[in-house]
Curated annotation (Swiss-Prot):
Its main location: membrane. Belongs to the NhaB Na(+)/H(+) (TC 2.A.34) antiporter family. This is Na(+)/H(+) antiporter NhaB. One of its GO terms (cellular component) is plasma membrane. Na(+)/H(+) antiporter that extrudes sodium in exchange for external protons. The chain crosses the membrane at residues 23-43, 52-72, 97-117, 120-140, 144-164, 202-222, 238-258, 303-323, 348-368, 391-411, 447-467, 475-495. It is a multi-pass membrane protein. It comes from Escherichia coli O1:K1 / APEC. The lineage of its organism: Bacteria, Pseudomonadati, Pseudomonadota, Gammaproteobacteria, Enterobacterales. It is found in: Cell inner membrane. It comes from the Bacteria. InterPro entries: Na+/H+_antiporter_NhaB. It catalyses: 2 Na(+)(in) + 3 H(+)(out) = 2 Na(+)(out) + 3 H(+)(in). GO terms for molecular function: sodium:proton antiporter activity.
Length: 513
């Protein structure tokens, strides 16, 4: 018997999301206008809390849908205006271009990145050195490329290698269900479990590496570009401004990588089983023999384009998004990708997040119109200039660990800029606060997958169930990094940021605008 119209509508609404989640969103949509009539300020904060809730529940439903419904209602009932949303989007056009074009551009360089990580995995036998190499490679690449793309490449390598060994272990040559272990005997299962532990640790090291590198440059994370634009910094300025905090954090993060591997803490320390290495090496040898001259020239071209990308960013030859567009044009032209559908695949990863970011800007418009963060900012600004830096770092960190860091970074830099324009803080203090906001937004966010988009991408990937990487296990494995990155970052903001920045100014390396 066919279901009723009402039941059909209920099932279609937010698709496979749990019933309690659907009901919660409907309650939000009903309650918000009623609260807005009584107290716009309370209604605004309620909207922010609801939006953070949708981000925290990203595994239940992609936040664009529930967050978008809340944002549309907010505009309809007058919490903000469509014109203000348009102004926020226009002011952050560079970030949208970064997501649309840079992420798509790096998609066409995946062969080179796959080649790099494959060579690392098979060339380095020491697990400590291999873990450090993955962390450093991910950090370096994420300083210039999109972190999601770097993680996507490492996932591709891991899934490919897992599939190769799984087929051997299950004695099947054809593609099989990688989650089906029923055809694997006990001995192979023990080796497979060890291999899973090995891949889990490598993925976490690479994920943290993207955070370590991503915080250092204006293109490392989307919120970095928002903060750089608000402060009027170019690529080199941004790197130097952040370095009093980010360089010590990078060093301590890499030492943490070595320490957890050496002591086998928090689920780290598993080595690559020799039987697995033999299987993977045989496969790689066959692949290299089959690589044609055309394939080799593609890798060379992609490496040259990579040099162009780094040079163009460092010299600020154009806006970041336009440099990304040039990468798309060069990579597709010189590697023979001419089909519209093949080019279109490059945009599938970035456009949903670009749409979600536009919804973020709608909520930011509400925050500005309803002056939601004014009490918090006033509280922070009542403290001494020195204490303000730590307070901004801590408030950013707390919110970023449970919510999206683009959203958090945008809110706080807007509030700090408004305080500077009103004369509440000096330009020099504003620039120091911008560093505290950027580092506070990026570093503590490794605590949960909700804070780091790269972690969330890993958790929702096809690899996570294969290597038994759950939400809880990811939080546990990230814990040593969370503690070290957060505390070292706070100490640097407290003690090294102001004096080192002052020294940079005396040396003439940076200047207050």
């Amino acid at each position: 018997m066919e279901i009723s119209w009402g039941r059909a509508l209920w099932r279609n609404f937010l698709g496979q999301s749990p019933d309690w989640y659907k009901l919660a969103l409907i309650i939000f949509l009903i309650v918000n206008p009623l609260i807005f009539l009584i107290s716009p300020f309370v209604a605004g904060w309620l909207l922010v809390a609801e939006f953070i809730f949708t981000l925290a529940m990203a595994l239940k439903c992609y936040p664009l849908l529930p967050g978008g419904l809340l944002a549309i209602e907010a505009v309809f009932i007058g919490m903000t205006s469509a014109e203000h949303v348009r102004e926020e989007v226009a002011a952050n056009l560079e970030v949208l271009l970064l997501l649309m074009f840079m992420v798509a551009g790096i998609y066409f360089m995946k062969q080179l990145l796959l080649f790099i990580f494959t060579r690392l995995l098979l060339s380095i036998r020491s697990k400590m050195l291999l873990s450090l190499s993955f962390c450093v490679a991910a950090a370096f690449l994420s300083a210039f490329l999109d972190a999601l793309t770097v993680v996507a490449v490492v996932i591709s390598v891991a899934v490919g290698f897992y599939g190769i060994y799984h087929r051997v272990a299950s004695s099947r040559t054809e593609d099989t269900d990688l989650q089906d272990d029923s055809h694997i005997d006990k001995h192979y299962k023990v080796v497979l479990e060890q291999f899973r532990g090995f891949l889990r640790s490598l993925m976490m090291h690479a994920g943290v590496g993207t955070a370590l590198g991503g915080v250092m440059t204006m293109v490392g994370e989307p919120q970095n570009l928002i903060i750089a634009k608000a402060a009027g910094w170019h690529f080199g300025d941004f790197f130097l401004r952040m370095s009093p905090v980010t360089v010590p954090v990078l060093i301590c993060g890499l030492l943490t990588c070595l320490l957890v591997e050496k002591l086998r803490w928090f689920g780290y320390g598993e080595t690559l089983p020799e039987k697995v290495r033999e299987v993977l090496q045989q496969f790689d040898d066959q692949s290299r023999l089959q690589r044609t001259r055309q394939d080799k020239i593609r890798l060379i071209v992609q490496a040259i384009i990579g040099v162009w990308l780094v040079t163009a960013l460092a010299l600020h030859l154009a806006e970041v998004g336009l440099i990304g567009l040039s990468v798309i044009i060069l990579a597709t032209s010189l590697t023979g990708v001419t089909d519209e559908h093949a080019i279109g695949k490059a945009f599938t990863e970035s456009l949903p997040f670009t749409a979600l970011l536009t919804v973020f800007f709608s909520v930011v418009a509400v925050i500005i119109d309803q002056q939601l963060f004014s009490p918090i900012i006033q509280f922070v600004l009542q403290a001494s200039e020195h204490a303000q830096l730590s307070l901004f770092y801590i408030f950013n960190g707390l919110l970023s660990s449970i919510s999206d860091n683009v959203f958090v970074g945008t809110i706080y830099i807007n509030e700090a800029k408004a305080a500077m324009k009103s004369g509440a803080i000096t330009l020099k203090q504003y620039e120091l606060l911008a560093v505290a906001i950027n580092t506070g937004t990026n570093l503590p966010s490794v605590a949960t997958p909700n804070g780091q988009a790269a972690f969330l991408f890993l958790l929702t990937s096809a690899l996570a169930p294969l290597i038994r990487l759950s939400y809880g296990r990811m939080v546990w494995m990230a814990l040593p990094y969370t503690l070290v990155l957060t505390l070292v970052g706070l100490l640097c903001v407290e003690f090294t940021l102001a004096p080192v920045t002052e020294w940079f100014m005396q040396m003439g390396w940076i200047a207050t605008l």
